[in-house]
């Protein structure tokens, strides 16, 4: 009789499972998130300059500190004028110069305010709105739908023919995060509205603009009218509703009001034959407001937003007032972050790839890239096997799904090609001017893509970003360098820990290619129906079951998670975790997983996954997330494990415990 292989006890390096952060008094089957993270939650205070604190924000803080070191060094170097290193140093130093910013007052903004004050008619209004258009939204890759400008622009491959780029126009114009903040009748929202109107008046007063309260009332009334024509967050995320290519000349008849010829000419889009209207009803409604509302009100509105959006590079009184509303009231954050942090983040936003090259050279070892690439390969193989084993999917649909999986491009660490900043002018001492020029540079860089071949290897995140992304139109994934550290990834940890951590993130991003949105794009990034009707019906039914599960989560008595709004992320969590669990099992090669910290391999895998989601969020910020974000609160994402059969024996979860689901009720999407 052969001996049964016994698990070996191995130490973990760096992070592993944070046993001290657990709360073993909680039953895993009643509250898995609390069991994994309860000790950490009790012991952790959210930093005063943060609205939330958790694994992602802790790593982001570390990336910010690392970047500060690099930028401080750059400032001390005598880099040649015009070099990227000099631009990085001068941009950063200009943002640190609080005394210089205070001394300049509103002077750097006067040309913009003068242009607004000089507007004489709606044609000139349209021209100015076009001049102010920026590439400040990304509805698909970053699910970023918000801009305080009347419209936002996104340049990306054509959803119907992804070998060419198209400009996409999105709704905007609101100072509050979402139309619900204007239209929800609850006392809580009414209080936020009153404070926002007071904030508008306060900014106008600081700028010595007379009759601030009356103007604030008119500005707020205009934004409320905008909110009434806005499309909801849930509908905005529906790509089938968004693919509306309009001929440029048709905007005048489809969305009458705004002088579109003047708008597009000023925006540099007058040579584009087609512009995609992402939210056509909203664009139509906003265009009508351009002529139905008094020009004087538009001038007041534009002046307020011109000042408010630049508060970070204006005298401290403006910054403090903006933080008082957006930081304290909307997010519940009690304290403004230090100037160096804000300077790092601003520099990162303007010159992200230049900073990224410094970051990768210092902090990203080549061996980490190789390890992650191997893990990606294993998880893709596991997902491929899961497709083979789907008993409900027709052979022809499986062929299409496997084709999409096999052609997936995976970028790890950093891009193959960096952005060239030679066309960006950075002037030491001009914090506001640098910010404006950086935004315009980014806008023109996107416009320059129109008419060019699509770069399928283009990155949409910088290496120092703690995140990962699926790019449906490129059928690609990006895993930036900054996420490849504990607790996501630790070269010295067990395979179970790494697969539960970074592996589940990899699986999540792969699975976005097959969530309710990604599944509508084929292997070439084209919006196409590659499903049989029966397969699609089964897939949608599973999605509805998962949405219903998340609809039962109540973070507050008066506010529930929106299962439909968060469905893409929830499908990616579930499918990704399932495929990653398979990949981890395959990586064992038939051997027994080693014990670590007294936990079996199965337990390590699920504990590592749960540990990734540890987060504390201030109530106002959590409410804002639930209303505006496509991601469910972290604690419910950790409870995704309740849908995996393997989780039940790993923690001896029994019927009657809170998270227990009967096998027939466990959602299986892929």
Regions found by a protein language model. Give the residues of each.
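Boundary at the C-terminal end of the N-terminal hydrophobic targeting segment
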Residues: 3-7
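Short, Gly/Pro- and small/polar-rich lid/capping loops
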Residues: 8-20
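Active-site-surrounding "flap" and adjacent substrate/cofactor-binding loops of secreted or lumenal enzymes
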Residues: 10-11, 26-103
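Hydrophobic/aromatic-rich, well-ordered segments within soluble, folded domains that form packed cores
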Residues: 22-42, 182-204, 393, 567, ...
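Short, solvent-exposed loop/turn and secondary-structure capping segments
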Residues: 43-47, 154-156, 178-180, 230-233, ...
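Short secondary-structure subsegments characteristic of cysteine-rich extracellular domains
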Residues: 49-71, 212-229, 498-504, 602-605
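Noncatalytic, helix-rich "gating/capping" subdomain that lines the substrate-entry/channel surface
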Residues: 74-378
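Intrinsically disordered, low-complexity linker/terminal regions across diverse proteins
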Residues: 225, 254-257, 269, 276-280, ...
């Amino acid at each position: 009789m052969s001996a049964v292989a016994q698990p070996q006890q191995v130490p973990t390096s760096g992070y592993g499972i944070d046993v001290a952060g657990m709360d073993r008094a909680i039953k895993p089957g009643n509250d898995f998130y609390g069991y994994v993270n309860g000790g950490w939650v009790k012991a952790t205070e959210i930093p005063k300059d943060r609205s939330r604190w958790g694994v992602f924000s802790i790593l982001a803080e570390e990336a910010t500190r690392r970047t500060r070191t690099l930028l401080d060094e750059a400032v001390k170097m005598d880099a040649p004028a015009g070099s990227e290193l000099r631009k990085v140093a001068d941009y950063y130093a200009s943002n640190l110069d609080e005394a210089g910013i205070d001394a300049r007052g509103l002077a750097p903004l006067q040309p913009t305010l003068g242009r607004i004050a000089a507007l004489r008619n709606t044609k000139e209004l349209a021209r100015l709105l076009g001049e102010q258009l920026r590439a400040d939204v990304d509805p698909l890759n970053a699910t970023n739908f918000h801009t305080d400008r009347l419209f936002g622009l996104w340049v990306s491959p054509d959803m119907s023919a992804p070998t060419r780029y198209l400009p996409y126009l999105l709704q905007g114009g609101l100072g509050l995060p979402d139309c619900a903040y204007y239209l929800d009748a609850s006392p809580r929202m009414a209080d936020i509205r009153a404070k926002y109107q007071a904030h508008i008046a306060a900014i106008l007063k600081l700028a010595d603009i007379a009759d601030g309260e009356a103007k604030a009332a008119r500005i707020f009334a205009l934004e409320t009218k905008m909110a009434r024509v806005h499309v909801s967050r849930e509908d905005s995320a529906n790509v089938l509703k968004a693919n509306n290519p309009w001929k440029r000349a048709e905007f005048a008849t489809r969305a009458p009001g705004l002088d579109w010829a003047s708008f597009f000419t000023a925006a540099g889009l007058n040579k584009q034959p087609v512009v995609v209207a992402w939210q056509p009803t909203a664009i139509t409604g906003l265009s009508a407001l351009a002529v139905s509302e008094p020009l004087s009100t538009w001038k007041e509105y534009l002046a307020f937003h011109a000042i408010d959006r630049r508060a970070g590079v204006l005298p401290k009184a403006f910054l403090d007032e903006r933080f008082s509303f957006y930081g304290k009231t909307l997010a519940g954050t009690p304290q403004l972050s230090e100037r160096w942090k804000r300077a790092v983040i601003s520099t990162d936003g303007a010159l992200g790839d230049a900073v990224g090259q410094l970051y990768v050279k210092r902090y990203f070892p080549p061996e980490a890239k190789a390890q992650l690439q191997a893990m990606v390969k294993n998880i893709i193989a596991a997902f491929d096997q899961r497709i083979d084993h789907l008993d409900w999917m027709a052979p022809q649909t499986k062929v299409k799904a496997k084709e999409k999986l096999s052609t997936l491009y995976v970028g790890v660490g950093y891009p193959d090609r960096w952005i060239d900043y030679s066309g960006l002018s950075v002037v030491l001492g001009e914090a506001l001017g640098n910010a404006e020029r950086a935004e315009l540079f980014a806008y023109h860089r996107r416009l320059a893509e129109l008419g060019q071949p699509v770069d399928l290897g283009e990155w949409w995140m910088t290496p120092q970003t703690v995140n990962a992304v699926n790019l449906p139109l490129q059928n690609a994934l990006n895993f930036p360098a900054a996420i490849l550290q504990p607790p996501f990834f630790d070269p010295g940890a067990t395979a179970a820990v790494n697969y539960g951590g970074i592996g589940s993130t990899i699986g999540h991003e792969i699975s976005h290619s097959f969530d309710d949105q990604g599944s509508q794009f084929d292997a070439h990034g084209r919006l196409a129906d590659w499903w049989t009707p029966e397969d699609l019906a089964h897939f949608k039914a599973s999605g509805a079951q998962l949405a219903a599960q998340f609809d039962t989560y109540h973070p507050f008595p008066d506010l529930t998670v929106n299962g439909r709004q968060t469905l893409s992320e929830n499908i990616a969590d579930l499918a990704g975790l399932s495929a990653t669990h398979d990949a981890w099992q395959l990586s064992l090669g038939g051997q027994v997983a080693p014990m670590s910290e007294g936990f079996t391999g199965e337990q390590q895998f699920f504990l590592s996954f749960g540990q990734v989601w540890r987060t504390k969020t201030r109530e106002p910020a959590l409410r804002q997330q639930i209303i505006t974000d496509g991601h469910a609160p972290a604690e419910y994402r950790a409870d995704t494990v309740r849908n995996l059969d393997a989780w039940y024996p790993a923690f001896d979860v029994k019927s009657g415990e809170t998270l227990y689901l009967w096998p027939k009720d466990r959602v299986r999407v892929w």
